[in-house]
Amino acid sequence: MAIGLIGRKVGMTRIFTEDGVSIPVTVIEVAGNRVTQVKTLETDGYRALQVTTGTKKANRITKPEAGHFAKSGVEAGRGLWELRLADGEGEGIEVGAELNVGIFADVAKVDVTGQSKGKGFQGGVKRWNFRTQDMTHGNSLSHRSNGSIGQNQTPGRVFKGKKMSGHMGAERVTTQNLDVVRVDVERNLLLVKGAVPGATNGDLIIKPAVKA
């Protein structure tokens, strides 16, 4: 089954192999994903599962959300996510079903999607790895400036897409082909090798790797 799940980044640690080799791992808490809606070709034009996870205070739920959760008969969660299904996937899954981390028991590699840490407004050196200019030799103001961006008469303008200073981070990022180190069904934990996007407690979408 190639269905993805929603998880929460707990943090990083390391585990040791039988040979004593240290492996850096990210701990992802994958609590039960409750199915709130099943989208089909007949009704929606495509196949997908809408899921929620976690909990949310009753006074923080909007009336449309409350009606949607009541209709599906599922406890309100901290958000709603949609997971697309390919042909033949998700057969037999109905509204109210709960998916857990056990579906990754036979998966070797996963793709993890999250929102990267926001860095605010940053210059070209930090944002795009530009080289700095001379610290001396007559340069007193432009050590970290972007340099020439539009030339003179030719082309006499700044090309679209030019790498410049601006807002950095807080983007949807996917890290591909992360090794699954351990699946702990009892504690709803998934351990993957290496780092994943985002800050601690951030929501993540975990799917079997498309390039595995």
From Swiss-Prot:
Disulfide bonds: none annotated. One of its GO terms (biological process) is translation. The keyword Metal-binding does not apply. Methylated by PrmB. Keywords: Methylation, Ribonucleoprotein, Ribosomal protein, RNA-binding, rRNA-binding. One of its GO terms (molecular function) is structural constituent of ribosome. InterPro entries: Ribosomal_uL3, Ribosomal_uL3_bac/org-type, Ribosomal_uL3_CS, Transl_B-barrel_sf. One of its GO terms (cellular component) is cytosolic large ribosomal subunit. Residues 136-155 are annotated as: Disordered. It holds the Pfam family Ribosomal_L3. Belongs to the universal ribosomal protein uL3 family. Part of the 50S ribosomal subunit. Forms a cluster with proteins L14 and L19. One of the primary rRNA binding proteins, it binds directly near the 3'-end of the 23S rRNA, where it nucleates assembly of the 50S subunit. HAMAP family: Ribosomal_uL3_B (MF_01325_B). This is Large ribosomal subunit protein uL3. It comes from Shewanella oneidensis (strain ATCC 700550 / JCM 31522 / CIP 106686 / LMG 19005 / NCIMB 14063 / MR-1).
